[in-house]
Regions:
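N-terminal helicase ATP-binding lobe
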Residues: 1-167
Length: 167
Protein backbone atom coordinates (compact mmCIF):
# COMPACT_ATOMS: atom_id res chain seq x y z
CA UNK A 1 0.00 0.00 0.00
CA UNK A 2 1.18 3.55 -0.73
CA UNK A 3 1.50 6.07 2.10
CA UNK A 4 0.51 9.55 0.89
CA UNK A 5 0.86 11.16 4.32
CA UNK A 6 4.08 12.96 3.42
CA UNK A 7 2.54 14.30 0.21
CA UNK A 8 -0.58 15.57 1.98
CA UNK A 9 1.20 17.50 4.72
CA UNK A 10 1.12 21.22 4.18
CA UNK A 11 4.53 22.62 3.59
CA UNK A 12 5.00 26.07 4.96
CA UNK A 13 6.43 28.40 2.41
CA UNK A 14 9.08 30.76 3.70
CA UNK A 15 7.55 34.14 4.48
CA UNK A 16 8.66 36.99 2.28
CA UNK A 17 10.32 39.85 4.12
CA UNK A 18 11.15 42.06 1.14
CA UNK A 19 8.20 44.51 0.99
CA UNK A 20 8.31 44.66 -2.81
CA UNK A 21 8.03 40.87 -3.03
CA UNK A 22 5.23 41.00 -0.46
CA UNK A 23 3.33 43.49 -2.62
CA UNK A 24 3.77 41.36 -5.72
CA UNK A 25 2.39 38.32 -3.87
CA UNK A 26 -0.69 40.06 -2.40
CA UNK A 27 -4.21 39.20 -3.51
CA UNK A 28 -5.05 42.80 -4.29
CA UNK A 29 -7.96 44.26 -6.20
CA UNK A 30 -7.53 44.81 -9.93
CA UNK A 31 -7.56 48.61 -9.59
CA UNK A 32 -4.40 48.36 -7.47
CA UNK A 33 -1.67 48.25 -10.08
CA UNK A 34 2.07 47.99 -9.62
CA UNK A 35 4.01 50.06 -7.12
CA UNK A 36 4.87 53.59 -8.23
CA UNK A 37 8.57 54.24 -8.87
CA UNK A 38 8.79 56.50 -5.78
CA UNK A 39 7.21 53.79 -3.59
CA UNK A 40 9.53 51.14 -4.98
CA UNK A 41 12.58 53.35 -4.40
CA UNK A 42 11.64 54.02 -0.77
CA UNK A 43 10.91 50.35 -0.05
CA UNK A 44 14.21 49.28 -1.64
CA UNK A 45 16.12 51.87 0.41
CA UNK A 46 14.39 50.81 3.62
CA UNK A 47 14.87 47.08 3.03
CA UNK A 48 18.49 47.26 1.85
CA UNK A 49 19.85 49.99 4.12
CA UNK A 50 17.51 51.02 6.93
CA UNK A 51 15.51 47.95 7.97
CA UNK A 52 17.46 47.50 11.19
CA UNK A 53 17.53 51.18 12.16
CA UNK A 54 15.39 52.08 15.13
CA UNK A 55 13.81 55.28 13.79
CA UNK A 56 13.00 56.11 10.17
CA UNK A 57 11.18 59.05 8.63
CA UNK A 58 9.50 58.75 5.25
CA UNK A 59 8.37 62.01 3.73
CA UNK A 60 6.13 62.14 0.66
CA UNK A 61 3.48 64.51 -0.63
CA UNK A 62 -0.22 63.81 -0.11
CA UNK A 63 -1.50 61.03 -2.34
CA UNK A 64 1.88 59.46 -3.09
CA UNK A 65 1.21 56.23 -1.20
CA UNK A 66 2.69 56.62 2.27
CA UNK A 67 -0.01 54.40 3.79
CA UNK A 68 0.81 51.51 1.47
CA UNK A 69 4.54 51.92 2.16
CA UNK A 70 3.92 51.86 5.92
CA UNK A 71 1.66 48.81 5.73
CA UNK A 72 4.18 46.91 3.58
CA UNK A 73 7.00 47.74 5.99
CA UNK A 74 4.93 46.46 8.91
CA UNK A 75 3.98 43.30 7.01
CA UNK A 76 7.68 42.74 6.36
CA UNK A 77 8.36 43.10 10.09
CA UNK A 78 5.54 40.69 10.97
CA UNK A 79 6.82 38.12 8.47
CA UNK A 80 10.33 38.41 9.89
CA UNK A 81 9.60 38.53 13.63
CA UNK A 82 6.05 37.22 14.21
CA UNK A 83 5.71 40.08 16.69
CA UNK A 84 2.94 42.69 17.14
CA UNK A 85 3.06 45.67 14.77
CA UNK A 86 0.80 48.70 14.85
CA UNK A 87 -0.15 51.41 12.36
CA UNK A 88 -1.28 54.57 14.19
CA UNK A 89 -3.24 57.35 12.50
CA UNK A 90 -3.85 60.83 13.93
CA UNK A 91 -7.66 60.40 13.92
CA UNK A 92 -10.43 57.88 13.39
CA UNK A 93 -11.15 59.12 9.85
CA UNK A 94 -7.60 58.41 8.66
CA UNK A 95 -7.62 55.05 10.48
CA UNK A 96 -10.74 54.08 8.49
CA UNK A 97 -8.98 55.19 5.30
CA UNK A 98 -5.94 53.05 6.18
CA UNK A 99 -8.29 50.08 6.70
CA UNK A 100 -9.74 50.67 3.22
CA UNK A 101 -6.22 50.75 1.78
CA UNK A 102 -5.29 47.52 3.56
CA UNK A 103 -8.41 45.87 2.12
CA UNK A 104 -7.72 47.26 -1.35
CA UNK A 105 -4.19 45.86 -1.38
CA UNK A 106 -4.97 42.60 0.44
CA UNK A 107 -2.81 43.32 3.48
CA UNK A 108 -3.92 41.41 6.60
CA UNK A 109 -5.03 43.79 9.36
CA UNK A 110 -7.22 43.96 12.44
CA UNK A 111 -8.85 46.74 14.45
CA UNK A 112 -10.03 47.32 18.00
CA UNK A 113 -13.79 46.88 17.72
CA UNK A 114 -16.68 47.84 20.02
CA UNK A 115 -15.56 45.28 22.62
CA UNK A 116 -12.40 47.38 23.08
CA UNK A 117 -10.26 44.26 23.43
CA UNK A 118 -6.90 43.93 21.75
CA UNK A 119 -7.24 41.42 18.85
CA UNK A 120 -5.47 38.08 19.23
CA UNK A 121 -4.22 38.30 15.62
CA UNK A 122 -2.32 41.45 16.61
CA UNK A 123 -0.93 40.02 19.85
CA UNK A 124 0.25 36.87 18.06
CA UNK A 125 1.98 38.90 15.33
CA UNK A 126 -0.30 37.64 12.56
CA UNK A 127 -1.93 40.91 11.49
CA UNK A 128 -1.20 44.63 11.59
CA UNK A 129 -3.31 46.54 14.09
CA UNK A 130 -4.66 49.73 12.51
CA UNK A 131 -5.91 52.28 15.02
CA UNK A 132 -5.84 55.97 15.88
CA UNK A 133 -3.76 57.84 18.42
CA UNK A 134 -6.64 58.42 20.86
CA UNK A 135 -6.99 54.63 21.37
CA UNK A 136 -3.42 54.44 22.64
CA UNK A 137 -2.90 57.64 24.55
CA UNK A 138 -5.73 58.08 27.01
CA UNK A 139 -6.38 57.37 30.68
CA UNK A 140 -8.11 54.06 29.94
CA UNK A 141 -5.81 52.67 27.27
CA UNK A 142 -6.38 49.00 26.43
CA UNK A 143 -2.63 48.66 25.86
CA UNK A 144 -1.83 48.77 29.56
CA UNK A 145 0.62 50.83 31.54
CA UNK A 146 4.04 50.10 33.02
CA UNK A 147 4.80 46.43 33.60
CA UNK A 148 1.32 45.46 32.41
CA UNK A 149 1.74 47.04 29.00
CA UNK A 150 1.73 45.20 25.67
CA UNK A 151 5.10 44.94 23.94
CA UNK A 152 4.96 46.10 20.31
CA UNK A 153 7.78 45.32 17.89
CA UNK A 154 7.22 48.03 15.27
CA UNK A 155 5.11 51.17 15.17
CA UNK A 156 4.32 53.38 12.21
CA UNK A 157 2.92 56.84 12.90
CA UNK A 158 0.98 58.10 9.90
CA UNK A 159 1.47 61.86 9.92
CA UNK A 160 3.61 61.85 13.05
CA UNK A 161 3.29 65.59 13.59
CA UNK A 162 -0.51 65.35 13.80
CA UNK A 163 -0.20 62.30 16.10
CA UNK A 164 2.15 64.16 18.42
CA UNK A 165 -0.21 67.15 18.51
CA UNK A 166 -3.03 64.78 19.59
CA UNK A 167 -0.91 63.34 22.42
Amino acid sequence: MIDFTNKLKKRELPKRINPIEIYESLDRRSEAGPLRPSQKKILEEWFNKRKNERDNIIKLHTGEGKTLIGLLILQSKINETNAPCIYICPNIYLAKQAVKDAEKFGIPYCIIDQSKTIPDDFLAGRKILITHVQKLFNGKTAFGLGSKSIQVDSIILDDSQACIDAI
